Design a protein with these regions (language model features):
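Outer-membrane beta-barrel "beta-signal"
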Residues: 115-117, 192, 221, 235-249
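Small side chains
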Residues: 11, 17-19, 50, 134, ...
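Cleavable N-terminal export/targeting peptides
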Residues: 1-30
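A mid-sequence, solvent-exposed acidic-amphipathic segment
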Residues: 169-205
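A generic structural motif
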Residues: 82-84, 214, 224-226, 236-238
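A generic beta-sheet turn/junction motif
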Residues: 163-165, 210-212, 236
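Contiguous ligand/interfacial binding patches
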Residues: 186-187, 195-198, 205, 209-216, ...
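Transmembrane beta-barrel domains of Gram-negative outer membranes and organellar outer membranes
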Residues: 23-155, 160-168, 178, 198-204, ...
Length: 249
């Protein structure tokens, strides 16, 4: 069985090509793990267009319809104009009740739109980690901590260090996040995780992360140097994942 897995990953690596390495994207288009941001950065001069399915357990507690959580989708456009900055624009579908008497369709979709930014003031060195600061939906204002529309509003600082072990890469990531809205309090505080990139499949990666409330596992890879795929399980049960097209500007 181990031989079959190794053969599969090697095939994925060959499809991806040897010139591009995976730099996993979180669901906002900003480089990170699955839910937790890191101090890694996208290649300079690249744009990324993608879409993700977000399980109801993956989204803020306030995203409910008739008292229940629901799965949704988002899409984003992200750019990395310089080695030290990333920007993205994210649109997420929201489920709302309709205002008419159409019994055939009692709900409709709205959208939450917001910007994300990440800055890396310190690049990774031999003896020190990379450091980054960032924000998701930083321009959102809330009158109180119930934060009716501040679904994703948060700020963070992250550190990342990579170790080379006989050609295999092990990444260690530590993040502190502050979500302003009380309904996202479960994600306030320390988060982090580890990433592993095998020597025989350098464009593929596995990760394990702790969000402050959940433990997530995921795998991702690049195919044909352009198409990024990520699939993960929240607490080993709830699937979220997506795809992204990366373009060199």
């Amino acid at each position: 069985m181990n031989g079959r897995i190794r053969t599969f990953l090697l095939g994925v690596s060959l499809l991806a090509g040897s010139g591009w390495r995976v730099s996993a994207q979180e669901y906002t288009g900003i480089t990170g793990m699955m839910h937790v941001p890191t101090a890694e950065m996208a290649p300079t001069g690249t744009a990324r267009i993608g879409a993700f399915f977000l399980n109801g357990e993956f989204t803020p507690a306030k995203l409910t319809y008739k008292g229940g959580k629901y799965g949704t989708y988002n899409h984003f456009l992200a750019i990395a104009p310089f080695s030290w900055v990333e920007l993205s624009y994210v649109s997420t579908l929201l489920k709302h009740p309709t205002n008419n008497n159409n019994v055939q369709k009692q709900w409709c979709y709205g959208k939450d739109r917001h910007f994300c930014i990440k800055l890396r003031p310190l690049e990774e060195g031999i003896y020190w980690p990379a450091l980054a600061i960032g924000a998701q939906d930083p321009t959102r204002t809330i009158e109180d901590k119930s934060g009716d529309y501040a679904y994703f509003n948060n700020f963070y600082v992250a550190a990342s260090k990579h170790l080379d072990i006989r050609g295999h890469e092990l990444g260690v990531h530590l993040t502190y996040r502050y979500y302003r809205s009380d309904f996202n309090a479960r994600w306030r505080g320390v988060a982090g995780g580890i990433t592993y990139r095998p020597a025989f499949a350098p464009n593929s990666r596995a990760l394990l992360e702790y969000t402050g409330d959940d433990v997530n596992v995921a795998v991702d890879c690049y195919l044909w140097r352009l198409l990024f795929l990520q699939a993960g399980l929240q607490n080993g049960r709830y699937f979220s994942g997506g795809l992204m097209l990366r373009i060199q500007l």
